[in-house]
Amino acid sequence: MNILVIETCALAKNVQFSDDDMIVSLVDGRTITVPLLWFPRLASASQKQLANYELLGDGEGIHWPDVDEDISVAGLLRGNH
């Protein structure tokens, strides 16, 4: 039996923060919520620094230049921290 596997790349479109979590909205409608404590640089950043992010590529990753943090969407989906 053959099984067709279609692999799609998860792409971020927006990042928001609550007091304790990072919320990443994906272009396919999914949302990833992870604790800020997983990323100490982000956990200690100011709201202004958190708001200053750049999507890398087509949204495969997220970069915060003020705190020198890079996170991949694929890594978030795998639970990497």
Regions found by a protein language model. Name each.
Residues 1-81:
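Motif-centric detector for short Cys/His coordination patterns
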